[in-house]
């Protein structure tokens, strides 16, 4: 019987740190559902003490996720641990993950404590977390640069205090595979109570070694791997969990381990995270890149025709990637759309068929054929759309020449429809001037991206913007066959978020004065 490797996903915590603007609670819950369906064992939903938004996200995910264990991060500080426990208490089963720095440079220059003091802080943190749950994970931050004698002392103390998972992070991505595997092996050889805990690893990719280091640790006895979908994370990112899962599946004969991952969900989960986080996947990325299963060499193509196994060690279908793009037209009925969604692997709870079909008909009237990737894009945006948006674009007309552009719009502002026209340096600039005038908001754009969703001239355009308003960053997205319209939707997405935030602030202020 093969050993089980626990998959611990931190896309919603460590991964989110790479984003210019935080995900909304709704977006995080959508990703959490996808991770649950993927078969992830533990979902680290956030760092509750860091902000009210993170607390709400963890609490919401803890309430709705049933088949994966929900985890929250905390420093080795009593208040952090108490807040983490409060956010998780609605969960059927949860984990508290507490950590403290252990490397010499961190202990001396960041914590400015003696190593004995740091060990006592770790013991106190683990014991406090155990008051709330038996499932406590303790991390030795910067373990990769921690002297092995100190690391062994810390691990032994944390296990004695009640930690059932000990995480060994390569926090700055410094170690080499043989070195990191050796650290894990020494822990098994030198820590007397090591059999009372699962050893976990959390590797960063600063030197491009995160996956290799994680696999070296598994070979040395680690039985939990932490990482993110698509390797998302600050700096160079984290260990890519889809790569870990497929390495273990493809080389299980050599490794002798397995995971609970449902591999056919990998492609869909990867695509969702990329879309919602606005983080494109490089074409040559292992497993989920657009070129991962392409063969352009004539010799390779000849071999593939004769026997796919000549150059293909895993199939596109094994990660849920369909070999053919499906297409529909405006004459296709609801049943056909549902059948295509079924073929793509989506279930009824993933989308609202009425909403999706209405959006599909509008798109089909515009572009003729609608492909599977179009349906997926429509589904993602429909799931994120708020029915109570105060500002909605009802009409858009653009006249553009070689010098200036003129844009006219009709904007629904609550119960009132307002009209505006403006001249600008291009149609998007003119459109944004109209929106600013009608809404009364003028915001600073930190980032503006346009990407194609689909193939050819009929592909959908996605606009993504990062905006700054009163010191807070907002992320907006828009999707349309017309990039000017998509740009307008993205700005209105941001402005509606700002409007809701202002409304909430006013309510809180009124309550505070009562």
UniProtKB/Swiss-Prot annotation:
Disulfide bonds: none annotated. GO terms for biological process: L-leucine biosynthetic process. GO terms for cellular component: cytosol. Its main location: cytoplasm. Pathway: Amino-acid biosynthesis; L-leucine biosynthesis; L-leucine from 3-methyl-2-oxobutanoate: step 1/4. Its EC number is 2.3.3.13. Mn(2+) binds at residues 14, 202, 204, 238. Keywords: Amino-acid biosynthesis, Branched-chain amino acid biosynthesis, Cytoplasm, Leucine biosynthesis, Manganese, Metal-binding, Transferase. Residues 5-267 form the Pyruvate carboxyltransferase domain. Catalyzes the condensation of the acetyl group of acetyl-CoA with 3-methyl-2-oxobutanoate (2-ketoisovalerate) to form 3-carboxy-3-hydroxy-4-methylpentanoate (2-isopropylmalate). Homodimer. Belongs to the alpha-IPM synthase/homocitrate synthase family. LeuA type 1 subfamily. This is 2-isopropylmalate synthase. It comes from Photobacterium profundum (strain SS9).
